[in-house]
Design a protein with these regions (language model features):
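Proline-centered turn/helix-capping motifs that create local helix->coil transitions or kinks
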Residues: 116-119, 127, 137-140, 174, ...
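A glycine/serine/threonine-rich, flexible loop-to-helix segment
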Residues: 141, 192-200
Length: 348
């Protein structure tokens, strides 16, 4: 039984990944600080597994991280832990810099020391879950793994810095890394500050559906289960010292995406007054430094790992909308105590 240290395993992507590993009977050590976006419901779900252990810990905590590597035999570290919402990085970049850069440094440095201390070095690897946003806005074509990194937000700059740090450890110390750069994820349990769940919940509650700028910014969407499948395949089949893009099949403007969600809600949960959800759409001031388009070339992972996304956007949105409609106890608590849907990321 392999033992995996999952950092950020109570977050959106991390929790889905932990669940998948546990279902495959792997041993999981889930390390998470339990910030505002953590899903406590999933933590309770994981308690039933005998091969699971949770440790509340900040990845910036040098002493605790060092002790974890001292007390456990770890086959791989998969780091999801990060501050991830671009708007929050505009409001408060400090947490993004310290967590996404210094925290990753702490993990990488301790992983290197651990790797140097074990005999079976070929069995260990460090996987960093990065983002497509490190490439910046793409006017033509699609970003490949060797494309220039050109971040435009404090969030993407912090993730780019972590990527560069890891690459430097590979060049300097031969550190066994793999970096993953997925496109925008969506699906069940996503904290409702992100576009898709925010639009779904605002629509259900009859609130405005805010569209930044003219709504023509383009994103590439990836259903959460497809991303988890890709990460798991790379964990077992990926090549050390490589970067892998993980992209969805479809690019779409934000306004078209929101209108698609509205049309699905009109059918799945029609309003009593028969008004269309689309009437709630409201154009608001654009996000500062808003990237126009993200686009990934994922041919490398297809060729080397034989991975392709299985869930198209139409099907993924359908599944996601139905999940939020059926799990209002989960998100109503968040809306009441953590985040009511207010605008974030305004100009200073």
């Amino acid at each position: 039984m392999k033992c995996f240290l999952i950092c950020g395993g109570a977050g959106f992507i991390g929790a889905h990944f932990v669940r998948s590993l546990l279902n495959d009977n792997h041993k999981v050590i889930n390390l998470d600080l339990l910030t505002y976006a953590a899903s406590l419901q999933t933590l309770h779900e994981f308690k039933k597994y005998k091969n699971y252990r949770f440790i509340k810990c900040d990845i910036r905590d040098k002493k605790k991280i060092k002790n974890i590597f001292k007390n456990f035999k770890i086959d791989a570290v998969i780091n999801f832990a990060a501050q991830t919402h671009v708007d929050r990085s505009i409001d408060n970049p400090d947490e993004f810099i310290t967590t996404n850069i210094l925290g990753v440094f702490n993990l990488v440095n301790n992983s290197l020391n651990y790797w140097n201390s074990i005999k079976k070095k070929k069995q260990f690897k460090f996987i960093q879950v990065s983002t497509d946003e490190v490439y910046g806005s793409v006017s033509k074509g699609s970003s490949k793994e060797f494309s220039c990194l050109s971040p435009n937000s404090p969030y993407s700059a912090s993730k780019t810095s972590a990527d560069h740090l890891i690459l430097s450890y590979f060049k300097t110390f031969n550190f066994p890394y793999i970096i993953l750069r997925p496109s925008n994820n969506y699906g069940p349990y996503q904290f409702p500050e992100k576009l898709i769940p925010l639009i779904i919940l605002n629509a259900i509650e009859g609130k405005q559906l805010p569209i930044y700028g003219n709504g023509k910014n383009i994103r590439n969407w990836l259903y959460i289960e497809d991303n988890v499948d890709a990460i798991k395949k790379i964990l077992f089949k990926g090549k050390i010292g490589n970067v892998y893009n993980i992209g969805g099949k479809e690019e779409i403007t934000n306004i078209k995406l929101v209108k698609n969600i509205c049309k699905k809600l009109d059918r799945i949960k029609p309003k009593k007054n028969k008004r269309k959800y689309e009437t709630l759409i409201t154009y608001v001031d654009d996000r500062p430094g808003h990237d126009q388009r993200y686009s990934l070339n994922s041919s490398k992972i297809k060729k080397e790992i034989n991975w392709l996304p299985k869930t198209n956007l139409d099907r993924g949105l359908e599944l996601t909308i139905k999940w939020y409609l059926e799990n209002d106890n989960w998100w109503k608590t968040i809306r009441k105590f953590k985040y009511k849907g207010e605008r974030l990321g305004k100009k200073r």
